[in-house]
Amino acid sequence: MKKKQQSSAKFAVILTVVVVVLLAAIVIINNKTEQGNDAVSGQPSIKGQPVLGKDDAPVTVVEFGDYKCPSCKVFNSDIFPKIQKDFIDKGDVKFSFVNVMFHGKGSRLAALASEEVWKEDPDSFWDFHEKLFEKQPDTEQEWVTPGLLGDLAKSTTKIKPETLKENLDKETFASQVEKDSDLNQKMNIQATPTIYVNDKVIKNFADYDEIKETIEKELKGK
C-alpha cells in the first residue's frame, strides 16, 4: 500500500513538472511571435521584396510578418488600411512586406507561395497577400496547405493552381525565402509583426497614432 502511494505521488510530481514545462514553452513562443522584441535600428533593405506605392516615396514602411501570426492578421486588417489611405495613396509612403517563419511548415509554405506570386504575377500580389491573411482562422490549426494556396492563387492571380503546387513541392522559390530569413537575422527580428518606419522600429504595431506620428516626423525631416 505504501509503495502504491509513493508511486502515485511520484507520478503526480512528474505530471506537474511536465505541465509547467509545457506552459513555459507556450509563454516563450507567444512572447517570440506576438510581443515586443529587440529588433535593431537601421533601415532594412527591400531589394527584391514586394513593394506597394511610388518608388520615389520619401518614407518606407516595412512589415516583418508571418501569414500564420494572429497579430499580423490584426495589423493587416486594422492598421495597414489606415497607412494606405493616409500615406501610400498620397505618394508619401511605400510599403514592403518581408516573410518571417515562426510558425513552422505552414509559415514556410505561405512564404514560398507569396514569393512565387510576387515573381510571376506582381500585379496580383497584394490581393493574394490580403486574402491569405483573411483565410487565417481564429483558432490555432494547420490551415495553410498546398490546396488552399492553389485555390487562392486561382481566385486572385494568373498562376495556375497546379503550377503553384508543383513549385511548392519543389521549393522553387526557396532562395527568396532564405533571403528573407537572412534579413530577419540581420535585423534581429524576434516578434511578428515588427514594423519599421525608415530606420525607426515601432514599439506597438497596434498603435496607429505612434505609426502616424513617426511617419509624419520622417516626412518633415526629408
Curated annotation (Swiss-Prot):
TM helices/strands, residue ranges: none
Major localization class: membrane
A molecular function (GO) term: oxidoreductase activity
Keyword Disulfide bond: yes
A Pfam family it matches: Thioredoxin_4
Annotated Thioredoxin domain residues: 37-220
Signal peptide span: 1-36
Keywords: Cell membrane, Competence, Disulfide bond, Membrane, Oxidoreductase, Redox-active center, Signal
Keyword Transcription regulation in record: no
Cystine pairs: 69-72
Name of the protein: Disulfide bond formation protein D
